[in-house]
A protein has these predicted regions:
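Short, active-site-adjacent cap segments at secondary-structure transitions
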Residues: 13, 38, 159-162
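Broad structural signal for hydrophobic residues in well-ordered alpha-helices, predominantly aliphatic
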Residues: 21-22, 40, 144
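Active-site metal-binding motif and surrounding structural segment of the metallo-beta-lactamase
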Residues: 1-31
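Glycine-rich, phosphate-binding/catalytic loops in enzymes
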Residues: 22-24, 111-113, 169-170
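Short acidic, glycine/proline-enriched helix-loop-strand junctions
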Residues: 27-28, 161-170
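Metallo-beta-lactamase
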Residues: 31-163
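Short amphipathic alpha-helical segments
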Residues: 18-20, 43-45, 108, 165-167
Length: 170
């Protein structure tokens, strides 16, 4: 019973399945940065996808007609110029997209980060290559500190919770 799709940014690992989801349920509301609406609308099997643009400052997104709201948190230039994380204030969970992502070998993989110093080696290369702007990352960390998530869930790698949230933001 999917009602909303949130595309954190324009990459195919986020958007390439949109057409299939919309074929299953054309009523799904799809949100992405205004910057990428023209680009992402072409991830279709024929018809152009209609998207709900997210302004640069972010926005609240209602899940369904009377459901809870989640917040699109700006993460611009943290991998993509029109990038957002998604915060669920009810659960206290921030879905960070690629921020905090890691390429963890199978023999070290775990659902949750328990040793930040061990884990950072799997994050370093990706972040240096795809998120080289410390100014952009500082802006994101300030916004995230203000909302105080109890958990940060990147789309690649392990989850940060408890004290590991603070270590990631530091």
């Amino acid at each position: 019973d999917i009602r909303v799709i949130f595309a954190s940014h324009q990459d195919p690992d986020i958007c390439s399945s949109l057409a299939m989801w919309l074929d299953l349920n054309p009523a799904i509301k799809t949100y992405c940065s205004w910057l990428w609406t023209g680009f992402v609308s072409h991830f279709s099997t024929g018809e152009v996808i209609t998207l709900n643009p997210i302004p640069d400052q972010g926005m609240r997104i209602r899940i369904g007609d009377e459901g809870p709201e989640v917040e699109a948190v700006p993460a611009h230039y943290c991998h993509s110029s029109g990038n957002f994380s998604l915060y669920d204030p009810t659960a206290g969970i921030l879905f960070s997209g690629d921020i905090g992502g890691a390429l963890v070998p199978d023999h070290h993989a775990s659902l949750v980060v328990t040793d930040f110093e061990q884990h950072i080696q799997y994050m370093r290369g990706f972040h240096l290559r795809w998120m080289p702007s410390t100014v952009a990352l500082r802006g994101w960390t300030q916004r995230v500190r203000a909302i105080k998530p109890r958990m940060i869930c990147p789309q690649h790698g392990s989850i940060f919770e408890g004290e590991m949230v603070g270590k990631l933001l530091d």
